[in-house]
Amino acid sequence: AVIHNHLDAAMQAANITGTLYAVQAAGQLGARCFHHVSSIAVSGLYRGTFREDMFEEAENLDHAYFRTKHESEKVVRQQCRIPYRIYRPGAVVGHSRTGEIDKIDGPYYSFKMIQRIRNVMPKWMPLVGVDSGINNIVPVDYVVNAIDFLAHLDGQDGGCFHIVDTEHHSTGQMMNIFAEAAHAPKFVMRFDPK
């Protein structure tokens, strides 16, 4: 519980308080537009298609990351006194050509497990794995290029833009993509633990 509360407080400080300070600074500096990088996580565990024009419809925001991302976007929507644009990328991963990334989180946590499997099992060995939920991962260069393009479009202030891959992958599919890249065995039998 102590670790959970510490992480919750850190996310609150970074996502909500940090956004509030940035919005206030942009207003005081007379910025022409506030560009907020949010996340598709603002939808929480919404079932179905969460469109760019949706916000209040978010569901099941119990997880600290979902909740703080949602609240930080709310700060922009309610307290920003200058024009703004909101960008909601999927889970950001490394550069599409080089793989380079400057932080390890999200899907990267599974890499160590896949490396361990690769080191003890032959590549031809079929594995059983979990396959729950859909993931949307986008390379960092795709996100940067999309934001650069959208930030320079005329007449889009107040807009919200999803920066996602139109081809979603299940957890099992994603793990197999990573396993193939690591020359590790694949998860040929996958089950949903629910």
Residue ranges, per PLM feature:
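Mid/C-terminal beta-alpha module of Rossmann-like enzyme folds, strongest
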Residues: A146-K194
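Glycine/proline-rich active-site loop of Rossmann-fold NAD(P)-dependent oxidoreductases
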Residues: H95-Y108, F149-F161
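Conserved catalytic Lys-bearing alpha helix of Rossmann-like short-chain dehydrogenase/reductases
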Residues: I16-A22, T68-V76, S110, V143
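Glycine-rich Rossmann NAD(P)(H)-binding loop
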Residues: V92-R97, L127-I134, F161-H169, F178-E180
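Conserved Rossmann-fold NAD(P)-dependent oxidoreductase catalytic core, especially the SDR/UDP-sugar
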Residues: D8, A13, T17-A64, Y84-R85
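Active-site Tyr-X1-5-Lys
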Residues: A25, E59-G90, H95
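Short-chain dehydrogenase/reductase
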Residues: Q12-I16, L61-H70, I104, G133-I137
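A conserved pocket-lining segment of Rossmann-fold NAD(P)-dependent short-chain dehydrogenase/reductase
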Residues: L7, T98, P107-Y142, A146-L150
